[in-house]
Amino acid sequence: MNLTHTQLAEHGYMSGFANEFATEALPGALPVGQNSPQRAPYGLYAEQLSGTAFTAPRAHNRRSWLYRIRPGAVHKPFTLVEQSRFLSRFDEVPPSPNQMRWSPPAMPTTPTDFIDGIVTMAGNGGPDAMTGCGIHLYLANQSMQDRFFYNADGEMLIVPQQGRVRFVTEMGRLDVEPQEIVVIPRGVRFRVELPDGEARGYICENYGALFKLPDLGVIGSNGLANPRDFMTPVAAYEDREGDFELVAKFQGNLWRADIGHSPLDVVAWHGNFAPYKYDLRRFNTIGSISFDHPDPSIFLVLQSPSDTPGVDTIDFVIFGPRWLAMENSFRPPWFHRNIASEFMGLITGVYDAKADGFAPGGASLHNCMSGHGPDADTFAKATSADTSTPHHITDTMAFMFETPGVIRPTPYAARSASLQQDYYTCWQGLKKHFNPNVR
């Protein structure tokens, strides 16, 4: 949505990344000068939602205080849900060094909501060790009805590819369209509505440290994803009673509990642990204006840091519209073998390193040290292109989840009918040009 900040405020958003926000849906619902008064305004309950340890350094501490109609503990006991699609187990299929690519999956033919429509493609690590990630697709054709969800295993970075999605969370509402992303923190309860009837996209489930903006180094004080373009919702609440279901993801399994009211009953909240969205089209792309294609780290939107400086548990990178001005240079992303592992998706358009076969809604996986790069057609065009004039790449948006750990496919991904068995052939047309007598 190309809205001004005034319009975004009118639509119910607050600007900034990890700011200390304060918002109330009823006047005076936030206590003044304290977090947990003896009696909260309007007969509300005070509840703290902690996203980091109590003693985490202040610059990294994430928590919010919620003022709600009923505490989060009010529900019946959870029971295990038997299912085999939304997982955190990545040891059932030996990971392969082969390059892998999947065509876009078809939409479901039976009524399927957001949670039932999630299928796990790959991942590494796990929620018990609080490191690594799960990579999933979602395919849905029905809004969640009388059903709510939260993820205790990690925060969810959601990348819509087809269809608008409305995330109605306990901390407010976010309307998201393709080429925007949304991040739902660990533990935040929500339901998903589908304004367009169908929706498809990607999810990165982050088991590790919270996503943050990367340091800019010599880029300076501005660039890449600017903090003011991240939008957090204002408080909005539901006061509904009925026969509802609360679904939780906990240690790789889904659990369900009966709940007699909507858990989206937060009337006011303050803090810096909250859902947010970001429009990828606002990314300030940095590139070379002399020669050579820089490393893809210049396209970094969000990172989940590890304990090793310079190494992230997850990098979220995008490849959007941009100008290529490098002279006498191979302009597409170069051939590469990487210590890290790369899972890519395409939101819209054509990816500049692949002329065919990588369609919007599809995905690819290039694991540690697996060779990859432009296909034969792209190489042929790029090596004969006129580089004396700039080239404008338009109408495209691809992304990458990059991790230092090997990304291990699930049985679903390894045996999927959408797996392109002939993917390797896109490089077989790369011919020998070597001649020791001609430089």
Curated annotation (Swiss-Prot):
Can you tell me which residues bind homogentisate? 351, 372
Molecular functions per Gene Ontology: homogentisate 1,2-dioxygenase activity; iron ion binding
Question: Per UniProt, which keywords does this protein have?
Answer: Dioxygenase, Iron, Metal-binding, Oxidoreductase, Phenylalanine catabolism, Tyrosine catabolism
* Gene Ontology cellular component terms for the protein in this record: cytoplasm
Ligand binding (Fe cation):
336, 342, 372
For this protein, the record's SUPFAM superfamilies field holds: RmlC-like cupins
Pfam families referenced in this protein's UniProt entry, alphabetically: HgmA_C, HgmA_N
What EC number(s) are associated with this protein in UniProt? Answer: 1.13.11.5
In which pathway does this enzyme or protein participate?
Amino-acid degradation; L-phenylalanine degradation; acetoacetate and fumarate from L-phenylalanine: step 4/6
Family according to the record: Belongs to the homogentisate dioxygenase family.
What quaternary arrangement does the UniProt entry report? Hexamer; dimer of trimers.
HAMAP family given in the database record: Homogentis_dioxygen
Which protein is depicted?
Homogentisate 1,2-dioxygenase
Organism for this UniProt entry: Cupriavidus pinatubonensis (strain JMP 134 / LMG 1197) (Cupriavidus necator (strain JMP 134))
Give the source lineage, highest ranks first. Bacteria, Pseudomonadati, Pseudomonadota, Betaproteobacteria, Burkholderiales
What gene is it encoded by? hmgA
